[in-house]
């Protein structure tokens, strides 16, 4: 029997290193766009769970998140860029269907909580209803262009492309909450890369240290994930990260574990391995941070989507740290 997981669950076997923002000064950070924008859509909401919207009824929570998160990271000395998902793997269809079912159930419970006047419950369920639409993705890219922040369009999984760019040395780390990044080969990833993050909030995960601590290879780490469950396959019921690790260390690989347990998986484990090791990466790209189009950004956020013009200008003023020759953004008006 199998069980679904939304992203691989490695919390019990991976020990992150605490770091602070000073450690990231001068570093280029690849941000997993889908992972981060989904956070914004889930968290940036009104008291009753309703997302931020403009006068047209269009969701703007992601615009707020991108504006303030990105400019804050730049103010702290980082050079962020975003990596967007391309076409999803066919192996992800079952997971996407399961997620849709969860969102629909949460939507019903959100409505019930609102009818009962239970604002706390309403907000809890509302945060689970977020959806990434084409409009949200295209709008996010448009805002980044106005801000002068580069983004990469991946062929496949954005986190895989971001991990590839870290491995190549074009970024210092991936900024994501998803442990899949180390499965894709990211040498470093940083969790909890938020505006309010302090010394104890940021977590650095180094692939080399993880493998050394667990005394396994990256291929074996992927095998553990296959047993536990990933975005691309159902895990084996009753196998968590610790048990999966012990089984792989005892038997050597996922094939021997499945043979010993006399269990068949719906997806060929070799297909899953190949997805993590032979992903369709974009190898030619340009990372160039440009001067922002202030008038365009202000018109887009304040004019079209009802943001406060003063707050937008104050946030955009932080972008001057990307170009030390500019003493003030007033020079770009």
State what each model feature region is:
Residues 52, 56, 92, 102, ...:
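A sequence-level detector of short, solvent-exposed, charge-rich linear segments
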